[in-house]
Amino acid sequence: MVQKRNHFLPYSLPLIGKEEIQEVTETLESGWLSKGPKVQQFEKEFAAFVGAKHAVAVNSCTAALFLALKAKGIGPGDEVITSPLTFSSTANTIIHTGATPVFADIDENTLNIDPVKLEAAVTPRTKAVVPVHFGGQSCDMDAILAVAQNHGLFVLEDAAHAVYTTYKQRMIGSIGDATAFSFYATKNLATGEGGMLTTDDEELADKIRVLSLHGMSKAAWNRYSSNGSWYYEVESPGYKMNMFDLQAALGLHQLKRLDDMQKRREEIAGRYQTAFQQIPGLITPFVHDDGRHAWHLYVLQVDEKKAGVTRSEMITALKDEYNIGTSVHFIPVHIHPYYQKQFGYKEADFPNAMNYYKRTLSLPLYPSMSDDDVDDVIEAVRDIVKGAD
C-alpha cells in the first residue's frame, strides 16, 4: 500500500508569484484601489489575448453572464437554454433576469451540451443559449451556432473553465456573440474574485459597461482622473458589478504567466491520462482533436462494476488514507431542491448528466503541483482500485 502523505494535497491552489505581489503593492501605494487604469489595461490585454474587439471586466463570471442577458433585453416570458452540468450560477443568472432556464442534456463523451438536444429544446419563447465549456473542453460551436442562426438566438458562452481553450484554431472568447470568463481563485487565471465579458459587439459592450457601474454614463476612472469631469449621468438603473484595480493588478501578471501555467497543466493531465487509461474501470476525459483543452479540471469517472469501488468510496479513501483532496463537478442543476420545486425537474430528465455525476470526481490539477505530488495521486488511485480486486 502507498504511504499516506505527510501534508494534505488540496484539490486546487492558485499560483501567485512575486510579480503579482509587487503589482498589487504598487497599486496600493498609488492610492487607486477601485476601478481605474489597471482595469482598463487588463481589459485591453485580455481582449487582445482572446482575439475579441471588446472586453469588460466585472466582479465575477456570474455578473458577466447576468449583465449580458440583461443588456440583450432578455426577461420575463423568455427562455434561455443551457447545460444541466454546470454550477448553479449559470442558471441563476437566467432566473434573475426574469427568464426561465431550460436544460438540454450533455453529450456523454464531451460532457458539453448536446447540439441535437439543444435543437429539440428550442421553443418560440427561446431567446438565447448559454453553452458551457465544461472542464476546459470546448463545445461543438459550429453546431451550436447553426442552431442559433436557424432560430435567431443570442449565443452567450460560459467560459468559466475555458481561459486558454481553443476551438478549431480560434480562441474561446472570439466565437459566440459574447463570452463570460471567471477569474475565481481556483481558475486557470486567478484574481481571487473577478470575471470578464468579451464580445465584438460594441453596442453590447457599452451597455454592459454602463450596467456594471450603477448605470452611469461615465466610469469612476474618467470622473476622478486628471482629465475627467465631476459630471455624470445615470442612463439606466444599473448594478455594482465592476472589477477594481487590485484584482486587475493580479490579472495582468496572471495573464503574462498563463502560457507557462498552461504547459504545466498539460503535463500533469498527460501523466494522468497515460496512467489511468491503463486501469480497468476508470474513464478518463475525452479530448477533442480540433482544439486545445484548457485542463481547468481533470474529471475521472469510476465504473463501479469494473473498478470494484464507487466514486464516493474513492473520494473518502483518497482523503482518509492518502491525504489527497478532491472535488465533484458538478451536482447537476436540475436535481437541486429549488429547481425541482420551481420548475418540476426530475432526476431522470437528463440521464447523461446524471450518469456522469454519479461516478465522477475531480483530481488535483494545478501548476504548482510537483512531480512527486502527481506520483502520489496516480499511485493512490491505482492502489485503491487494486485493493478493490
Swiss-Prot record:
GO biological process assignments: polysaccharide biosynthetic process
Residue numbers of N6-(pyridoxal phosphate)lysine PTMs: 187
Keywords, in A-Z order: Pyridoxal phosphate
This protein's pathway: Spore coat biogenesis; spore coat polysaccharide biosynthesis
Pfam families: DegT_DnrJ_EryC1 (PF01041)
Signal peptide (UniProt feature, chain positions): none
One GO MF term: transaminase activity
Cofactor names: pyridoxal 5'-phosphate
Matches recorded under CDD domains: AHBA_syn
Domain of life: Bacteria
Homology family: Belongs to the DegT/DnrJ/EryC1 family.
PANTHER family: DTDP-4-AMINO-4,6-DIDEOXYGALACTOSE TRANSAMINASE, TRANSAMINASE
Protein name according to UniProt: Spore coat polysaccharide biosynthesis protein SpsC
UniProt source species: Bacillus subtilis (strain 168)
